[in-house]
Amino acid sequence: MSETKRIKTALVSVYHKEGLDEIITKLHEEGVEFLSTGGTRQFIESLGYPCKAVEDLTTYPSILGGRVKTLHPKVFGGILCRRGLEQDMQQIEKYEIPEIDLVIVDLYPFEATVASGAEEPAIIEKIDIGGISLIRAAAKNYNDVVIIASQAQYQPFRDMLMEHGATTTIEERRWFAKEAFGVSSHYDSAIFNYFDGEEGSAFRCSANSQKTLRYGENPHQKGYFYGNLDAMFDQIHGKEISYNNLLDINAAVDLIDEFKDTTFAILKHNNACGLASRPTVLEAWNDALAGDPVSAFGGVLITNAVIDKAAAEEINKIFFEVIIAPDYDVDALEILGQKKNRIILVRKPAALPKKQFLSLIHISEPTRHS
């Protein structure tokens, strides 16, 4: 493994430029030279810093409507060359290939384009080729190269620059490589799932957002949630959601989505212990509670109707962990928020997933004994 490396040349080619200016400024102050393409090069030059066009290095223009820009040996040779291997260094000298020590790149917004409802030709154009290749090349050669593969890595990279300038340790480069392969694998999973549609020919699941929970099913276990809870709920009151809360919330959402009329449900340990559909939310609550008033203690409550003051006054008479509704009247929130730890969630309207998965029969790696 190599020692600390200094960044001398950076290749920068990004779709999203927010937050990039601070990094470019700091790199320029450290004497780093820039290579870039199209809009990113214009962005760097607009900050007042010189930037060499990739086309000047390769002697080829961007072609095929921008589909081919960086795919060239003079780019990838500079990224993949092993600085400690004499043969590699002789070849890049022979072919006049500059060493590239830092790659900052992000990917076309494929998932956002799919979610927008765009037609397939527009979606296909958002399948990144050059960017994903740059990410993999730089991550593979983390021994010599730093790869910044998404905006999510800007902050740790900024912190690193501020701490010790344009130098990196092998541990830092390896960490960024790990993050980069996470970006590339997630991106490819999204593309596969788009083409797979509802066929279900294989299971590919990737979630970028991780939330550390208070603990797992039991206090001695760790628990994590992968996904974006904020896209599904606004938590407007209460303690942090636990692993067991999430299990009950999931069961509650699955249940309430079966009903169109005003409905209230009470769940405990993933099972409904009371449910009623009635003309008003107050009536629905009263009859749902009547189903099993004992088991309702400490449960999760959910309704598909706005909770008003009258319903809140009755609901507030029992102890419960979580309540979920599409909205609450102001007076209702004031009543329900009297208990500090009570979790109050507003459920956001969201499209149901095309596929649902259930994890069964967990098989772990066998314990190896020496």
Task: Name each region found by the language model.
Residues 3-8, 69-76, 110-119, 138-139, ...:
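Gly-rich Lys/Arg/Thr-decorated short loops/hinges at beta-loop-alpha junctions or inter-strand turns
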Residues 8, 101, 321:
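Conserved acidic residues
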Residues 10-18, 242-244:
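Short, glycine-rich nucleotide/cofactor-binding loops
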Residues 18-23, 30-74, 78-82, 87-97, ...:
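Feature captures the catalytic cores and cofactor-binding loops of soluble hydro-lyases/lyases
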Residues 102-125, 129-168, 229, 368:
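A short, charged helix-loop
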Residues 152, 156-160, 164-328, 332-360:
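Active-site loops and adjacent core secondary-structure elements that bind or stabilize anionic groups
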Residues 361-370:
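Single conserved hydrophobic/aromatic residue that forms the stacking wall/gate
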